[in-house]
Amino acid sequence: HGGFWRMGDRALWSHLAAGALARGHAVALPSYPLCPEARIAGITRSIARALPAMAAEVDGPVHLAGHSAGGHLALRMACPDVGLPGHLAARLAAILALSPLADLAPLLEMPMNADLRLDPAEARAESPVHHPAPDLPVLVEVGAEERPAFLDQALWLADAWPDTHLTIAAGRHHFDVIAPLSDPASPMLDRFLGP
């Protein structure tokens, strides 16, 4: 889920599971510890610990999706330093990152860093753009009406991971780019989960 790693939980976003559920997919929406009590590296580890338990509940491919900070976390799960168990990494079928944060360096100078407590080393280590591109489909969707910083983040990831499928959604902004997740007939879900 989004919230700049500082706010929110799965309950705020559970309605977005409707599209995948209607297509017959199992869906898990984990919450995670929040900053400032946690650091971003710790949040990444928390999701990496939760993912095997969630995936063990079902067979078949695993698709990861996230929005904003959650998009960052979904992308991080495909980075080799996270160390997902091999059997789980082999099940990863696709990642859908909606308005993700892919390079955390700009956050070092922002007031919110008082809560995030990022230093340059952690910002680099936690930035997907500084890790090798995974060998699986990565879809990034960002709203055309987003703030320029979110458009930049999507473009930086597409540059760093050249096989990324980037969609700039006309008329969408940071808070409604996620809406197609709840529609089982959405082209976004076709691209992510298959027709």
Residue ranges and their predicted role:
Residues 1-6:
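Active-site glycine-rich loops that stabilize anionic/oxyanionic intermediates
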Residues 7-17, 28-61:
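Catalytic nucleophile-loop/oxyanion-hole region of alpha/beta-hydrolase
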Residues 25, 32-34, 100, 169-171:
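Active-site loop/turn elements of alpha/beta-hydrolase fold enzymes
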Residues 49-112:
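Primarily recognizes the serine-hydrolase "nucleophile elbow" in alpha/beta-hydrolase
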Residues 81-85, 161, 185:
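Active-site catalytic pocket residues across diverse enzymes, especially alpha/beta-hydrolases
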Residues 94-109, 120-156:
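The feature captures the conserved acid-bearing segment of alpha/beta-hydrolase catalytic domains
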Residues 151, 155, 162-195:
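C-terminal catalytic histidine-bearing segment of alpha/beta-hydrolase fold enzymes
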